[in-house]
């Protein structure tokens, strides 16, 4: 892919077997997000990034039992593949806009922060719940994963053999 920056300079992004790149368009095709899993800087953007950036928002139903706020797009897709609703902001460290949380609370009975099981994910999900617990029905779900690069998020949880039923059971266990 090649682009022209706002300063008029051209640049290109090239994928190879050694450096794969995945991308998807957002914001009506006005922007693109690249994921480079083997690069030091794994994420890149080009075009117009909506503010706030929320992946999955337009796929949410008007109402429902629960919605998950996750750390990334892959998490949202993994949840959807198992019949759950989710969204992701730009990262786990992104601040959740109060107006969006208010809207979610009007549409869903519960909002669950489902961040990675690493140090950052645990810290940030605890902070989000602390920030909003007195105003909205928010909680956090801690996955029983070691928090390593290979075992930290919901896609890893399902990849190691857990089922949709196991996930529902985990939700119910942590609720009590």
Language-model-derived ranges and their functions:
Residues 1-108, 124-125:
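Phosphate-handling DNA/RNA-contact segment within nucleic-acid enzymes
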Residues 63-67, 73-176:
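TOPRIM fold recognition
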